[in-house]
């Protein structure tokens, strides 16, 4: 049924149980409400309700609408009904055809006494195909459903109507019996009244006589006063005499306490509701008074005192603190941010902390001490408000000096609150901690992103005039930071103390660009600017000991700026997150160096530049940055030992990878060493040419390492290369199992190995390397003796020693 549509109606005589003399031609759907109720116009009236039960005020008839059957049923008071239908009536021709349809079932068959159901079914389906059997079963199912529908309409429905009518008749009989009894009682009462005789003289009033009343007992006067208490309360409340009104309430409570029976009676007396209503009005009035921001301290105290006397402690506390929070929010909205962050934070702190101080004084003067926990919770909520403003206004800056100044402003107010007896500094630090930690983490992410961009453009060319010191203009720093360090720690937050540096490197001081307009600059841009300034200033710096690539110089710049910035806001509680951030930065960089040195296209100079970078980070930069944070807090970084060990393992891996690569290059390219040369029988020249070439190549490599890295790295790298060369030679002999040395080849091999052991002795080569050399000599001697039928005697030890001593002497004289 759609809104605004009129449906034409006709009476359905088949379903109607009563005829109607009036034929209503249509029904109109006026409106459909949101709750599912319909408004329809029918019988010149408006009907309201759900479709299954709609009523109107002008008649007792009820109607129901069936949208599926398209019928409107009018139920009268006598349970009879008139049914109207819109749309088409059921087709009578189809009904007659259904009656006349061919019925394959002979019902007389089931009446026979000899009826056998199994035989009947077998005979019925024996000559039928599957399709015919399916059609027959469908026919039986349709007949079954039709039978059920007829039962519902013709039997069960009439049965329910009959049961309902029987109940109505029974109820009517009971009502008639009650009515008859009432009539009988009324007749008896009237008869008794008519038989009463009254002596009217007895009831005549004597004019001269006075009626004496017994005076009220003092004990009953308070009870009598209760009847006037609501009026007195109303007058006091309207005249704003709240003290008097509260006194009346207390008087009522005393009457209840002294007269328990009165309290019991008042539980069901209307007077109690009147009194409670007046007390509620009084309480609401006092609550509204307490919400007013214009109240003075003594007025607040008096109002709260009245509410406490009314046993409204919790409500008074809640409303008092809520009103103070509202006034603080209104005051904050009036603060105008003109661009000066410190001024804005100072005004914000003044408003909030002054309100907290006055609220604490009013609260302690008005409420009992056991309710102070609610005050503490409220103070923490206000501190949360400040921390949220900090997160939105302060921690979005990149100027850490401005951030530290803003934090110091709040801390100074907390210190003033401590002097008044309210210690809230701990709560403030607790609320600020997550925001500062997130600030450090964001700083770390920016550093790692900037470092990655720098590494993508790295050519691995060491800068020859880099000496570990970055120039800065200390004049750009505030005077308080040049000597005293951070505002928070009171210590040397920016320290040049390098007592832990074994190489006597000077710690670079980064220009922090602390100016009033630096707060909105992007940190990545600041890093690039500082890095470019450092490169430009290198022309005036003396020759340094290490050559660093541009990415390491960049890392040195940004990591020291990170230390200077964080030292301005650092506390001991921030040590864990700082340790984690530093560890992530250094591990990422060293891991990148480790992966980069494995690339085959890098030249020898580029590989040494990578080693130089790793040496600088492991031996100098990490310890220098850790010392700076230790000077600022007095505490060491949590993971310094583990971080140093991990970074050193990265450094060793970088050095070993280079040594392995260089050893293979020397064996294949410089020495041109081949194991087949040792198969000759004739004696060779007693001159170990390949290993003399190796010795000279190692000397040149040592000079290159000293030039491109430092002196300290020469011996570890050279010794590692020698060990790798010995391993390569041993592995190649093992892979060539059928190799048999000739007499001359064996003599030459022994000479080369002894010469290799001689010049390897000036390097800190592992003992296992010398053992491997002796093992190879011994094994090949045994193989020669076992595979030669008439072996020649080998040269003595003195023979090889004299040749090697002569070669060493000639090299020393030549050099």
Swiss-Prot record:
The alphabetized list of GO BP terms reads: exocytosis; Golgi to plasma membrane transport; protein localization; protein transport
Bias (Low complexity)? 494-511
Instruction: List, alphabetically, the InterPro entries matched.
Output: Cullin_repeat-like_dom_sf (IPR016159), Exo84 (IPR033961), Exo84_C (IPR032403), Exo84_C_1 (IPR042561), Exo84_C_2 (IPR042560)
Location of region: Disordered: 479-511
Which keywords does the record carry? Cell projection, Cytoplasm, Exocytosis, Protein transport, Transport
Q: Name one GO cellular component term.
A: cell projection
Subcellular location field: Cytoplasm; Cytoplasm, Perinuclear region; Cell projection
Principal cellular location given in the protein's record: cytoplasm
Q: How does it assemble?
A: The exocyst complex is composed of sec3/exoc1, sec5/exoc2, sec6/exoc3, sec8/exoc4, sec10/exoc5, sec15/exoc6, exo70/exoc7 and exo84/exoc8.
Q: What does this protein do?
A: Component of the exocyst complex involved in the docking of exocytic vesicles with fusion sites on the plasma membrane.
Homology family: Belongs to the EXO84 family.
Name of the protein described by the UniProt record? Exocyst complex component 8
Origin organism is Dictyostelium discoideum (Social amoeba)
For this protein's source organism, the top of the classification is: Eukaryota, Amoebozoa, Evosea, Eumycetozoa, Dictyostelia
Encoding gene, per UniProt annotation: exoc8
